[in-house]
Amino acid sequence: CVGLPGQTLEIKDRIIYLDGKANKEPDNVQYRYLVKTKRPIPDDLAHELGISKEDMMMYYTDASVYNMPLTEKAKAGLLARKDIVVSIENTPADDAGGLYPLNMYKNWTTDNYGPVWIPKKGETVKLTIENLPVYERPIHVYEGNELAVKDGKININGKETDEYTFKMDYYWMMGDNRHNSADSRFWGFVPEDHVVGKPIFIWLSLDNDRGWLDGKIRWNRLFTFVDNIK
């Protein structure tokens, strides 16, 4: 969860802002990059930097370019290898067609999104034809109201209105692998009755590229506490 009830969230050039302040990113946050190389990245270097074989699957042989997710640590590690890496550039974000809400704000992307106010229980939002798509799903699907637009006017449960008071708290979820996550940027707000718990610690972590006798268990991650749990 990166956004709480009542906060205003905006993403600017990949950075999350809450109520106008930049949010601290987790150490393991990943973004997708175009990595131009002189030769393929060796497996031992990839393993050292925490880059999986799956991460390196998108390799354009003719151009010697990987399209891959990297943490800041992995990015710095690759840039240090001048004998292998020529350059690392941001990938363009051009996915507005699949973002929430589907029927507006076509200039939004996963890297530049919002701002959106996250609904809070008991708080009232002013409704307009312009912002209705943002709040239509919480009002209609999650809180069970009949919602319609007639002659340019908003009607809730058969009555014309220009505001709505929310009955539940909502949250904004985003994955740490920012360019490979199906999260709130694609399906919107998460109502409180959909939240079933919160993570405390990692009890098992496996490396899919390794065998059981070859370092498959990531011992350094076992029983480590999840950051920012309150």
Go through the PLM ranges and name each one.
Residues 1-230:
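Extended hydrophobic leader/signal-anchor segments used for secretion and membrane insertion
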